[in-house]
Amino acid sequence: QAHTYRTLFPAMIKNWRKKWGTEFPFYWVQLANYMAADSLPAESTWAELREAQTMALSLSKTGQALAIDIGNPNDIHPRNKQEVGRRLSLIALHNDYGHTDLVYSGPQFRSMQIEGNKAILSFDHAESGLIAIERYGYLRGFAIAGADGKFVWAKAKIDGDKVVVWSDQIANPVAVRYNWGNNPDGTLYNAEGLPAVPFRTDDWKGITQ
């Protein structure tokens, strides 16, 4: 019921704040990577739930720590609690303890521009630069589609503070997805070592609607 979570999750936060009588900070951990990896781009209930969690950031005094890169395909609960805690602490230090110089989030999709067969992506929380972590040394995790909505794995490269995405199979791209799956393996981070937030540029009907 990931699509319903778009409504239920922020409603819960608002309800708890109402009952406590104060707009207290509310931070959470996004769903970690889990289960088998997809050999081809596919729809994913877990990806849709992660999207619903990210949407709740529209509420004031909220924050989200990612665990998309530290999960276990056979264990729903990531064992690396230290890194989860560290990422949550960055949010609290930035928002609540005056350390406004700290970068507390990985790159978050802002906008897309189409130029020929390429999609040019811009991000927030990437002021210090974008990197592909050394697991592969190149960008993974991107998929691209034309108007027919059929996604294929895409090539991607960092160009300054942007990411350029394309595929020789898609002449006229209209949508890009990143780390959209149950157990994706994307490699886009900011210079501070925080993973990019999974996203999609389309609003096509999901499998939980």
How would you name each of these model-derived features?
Residues 1-209:
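Catalytic-domain carbohydrate-binding cleft regions of carbohydrate-active enzymes
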